Amino acid sequence: MNYSLFISCSKGLEYLLEDELKGLGLHVTQVSPQGVYGEASLPVIYNLCLWSRLANRIQLILFSGHAAKEQAVHQLCTDFHWQTVFTHDKTIAIEFHGASEQIRNTMFGAQIVKDGIVDHFRRLNGSRPSVDKEKPQILIHAHLKNDILTVSFDLVGYSLHQRGYRKKAGKAPLKENVAAAMLLRAKWPELAAQGYGLHDPFCGSGTLVIEAAMMAAHIAPGLLRQDQSLQYWARHQSSLWEKLRTQALQQVKPLAVKLVGTDADGKIITLARSNAERAGVLPLVEFNTLPLNACRPGTKRGLVVCNPPYGERLGEVTQLVPLYQQLGTTLHTCYQGWQAAILTSSPVLAKALGLRADKQYTLYNGPLECKLYCLTLSAANKLKNTPDAPLSDNAQMLFNRLEKNRNHLQKWARKNQITCYRIYDADLPEYAYAIDIYNDYAVLQEYAPPASIPVHKAEKRSLEMLQVVPRALGIHPEKLIVKQRKQQKGSEQYQKIGKTSQRLIVTEGKAKLIVNLYDYLDTGLFLDHRLMRLKFAQLEPGTRFLNCFCYTASASVHAALAGALTTNVDLSKTYLLWAEDNFRLNDINLSKHQFLQYDCKEWMKTTRDKFDVIFLDPPSFSNSKRMSDILDIQRDHVSLINMAMRLLNPDGVLYFSTNLRQFKLEPMLKEKYAVQDITPQTIDQDFKRNSKIHHCFKIVMPHFADN
């Protein structure tokens, strides 16, 4: 007797799965997105459950029928002879997918199917199966599409990628069946049969190495677990199942060489060994803590297969280029005669390898579309895009510009006791980056390219930028931090992009300031406001100084070092704590200064304090949930300035600044106050190329305008 089946898989593996299933005896009737339909006898079904390395679920199709309405779904499920699938004493769960005009909720759909099953058994013998949503013995799938309901029984009860050996995983785990697909695309079974070795230099929790060992040693993945739902199937033949399990165990064979996994993280290596032990392949593999640049082959021939980091968070992709360049160099230099298969979602990182791929395959790591690049490592596969490769004509122009800027600005910065400054700001339009120096680090902020620029050109320029900057500026590649700068809205202005807690201390005049180059779009210090901060460093002792929207209060540090008494207001607790750290770093007594966590607009409305100098530097736009209202600086600057002026002593000064490039000051403010545009006086040497970086105004009461 043959049974109808649907075997699901990860997106992109359909035809690879078809080949595997045919080899296991399935008569394939249709290949569809994310799965294969076919017919099989009971022995073939058991072999599919034991041997498939690519499948997610193996579903026995029970029935299908027209079911546009709730009553029709219930009737179909009531009429089916469920006793041919399981008995009433089993626990069940329903997974429902799809919708119709009447059934728009999957929970509702599952309820209808469950009710139909329960009603059938009650009518049959007065008893009913219980529901267990966590770990049912019988899992039923119901799919409703185009008013056709298809119902099937999950023969295994869980996704087959859950082999059972991986109790814990690393930060970016690779599904076991996707790892198997990588190995099959790289022709690992054929290479293993020829005695090839294998090395994963980014092994993490060991999935690729373990799957490779299971393939090479002919270990059926289904042997690792004995909790398949098929044991509760009414037509299950336990003697046949045990016979096929025994035959699978007899096919296991030893390996001529150990397969190797290495990783720079020692903790994850311990986890990899534990996973290998649970998979029963620990004697076949070797896991070591080793950085990439120390990796060397243990055999003359082999396969390097890996899933290196490919940076899906903001700024990470380009930051990983040096790692991929190192991988390409290591492969080319040390692994001649080997094959390689490398998975990445980024074409930029693939190009950074500098090696030509023989073939590319599309795979999906979860929802993420990736490419598997298969390479032959030989002398004929020349290494390109290395950090020391010859520069293109355009890249040479960039090098010359950076070198010129460096020679000029380094002397100026040293003379003024400045260790952080902007050295480049899209001086050459085709290289649309801003580059800021922080001690011996360089932060590259990539402006989002316009849609008119082809992707491959933008990628080429990114690689050239990373090739040129270390040479021209004398910066170690590992000290390049790359972010993408774009027009920011609301909370994006201080968007967190990671968590490293890596802080760096920089110098600006007499002040020492803390910056974080990794975790946020901004570093904690707005370089374009340097001259304003240095102006506050000249305040008279005892000056009452208010810093509204204070951020990390770097301006207040300068004022406090001059002897001013500062009040610092910001909505962010994170930045206020950072501000306090800045004060402590400079040995400033915190008891003489205030750090207030408030919505600045609301605080200015209610406070009765008076100040001699106020620095008002709000974001261009903010819609933080903690604010009482949306802040739009073009719309709201009049009310903000009026509130700030109310807090000034009669002879006080307000400095209002904004980075909104198209900002226009409301003319009526000039009628009410003495307003002076001091923007040119606040643009330092490193921002002369971009004089519209901000607008700054000095505002006083009219009768003090001449003072």
Swiss-Prot record:
Q: Reaction catalysed?
A: guanosine(2445) in 23S rRNA + S-adenosyl-L-methionine = N(2)-methylguanosine(2445) in 23S rRNA + S-adenosyl-L-homocysteine + H(+); guanosine(2069) in 23S rRNA + S-adenosyl-L-methionine = N(2)-methylguanosine(2069) in 23S rRNA + S-adenosyl-L-homocysteine + H(+)
EC id? 2.1.1.173, 2.1.1.264
Signal peptide span: none
Query: Short name of one Pfam family for this protein?
Result: UPF0020
InterPro entries (alphabetical): 23SrRNA_methyltr_KL, DNA_methylase_N6_adenine_CS, RlmKL-like_Mtase, RlmKL-like_Mtase_CS, RlmL_1st, SAM-dep_methyl-trfase, SAM-dependent_MTases_sf, THUMP_dom
Report the record's disulfide bonds: none
Look up the domain of life of the source.
Bacteria
**GO MF annotation list:** 23S rRNA (guanine(2445)-N(2))-methyltransferase activity; RNA binding; rRNA (guanine-N7-)-methyltransferase activity
Instruction: Tell me where in this chain the THUMP domain is found.
Output: 44-155
Where in or outside the cell it occurs: the entry states: Cytoplasm
Ordered alphabetically, the record's keywords are: Cytoplasm, Methyltransferase, RNA-binding, rRNA processing, S-adenosyl-L-methionine, Transferase
Any one GO cellular component localisation term in the record: cytoplasm
| Keyword match Kinase | no
**Group of enzyme by EC:** transferase
Concerning its family, UniProt says: Belongs to the methyltransferase superfamily. RlmKL family.
State what this protein does: Specifically methylates the guanine in position 2445 (m2G2445) and the guanine in position 2069 (m7G2069) of 23S rRNA.
Protein name, per record: Ribosomal RNA large subunit methyltransferase K/L
Tell me what gene encodes this: rlmL
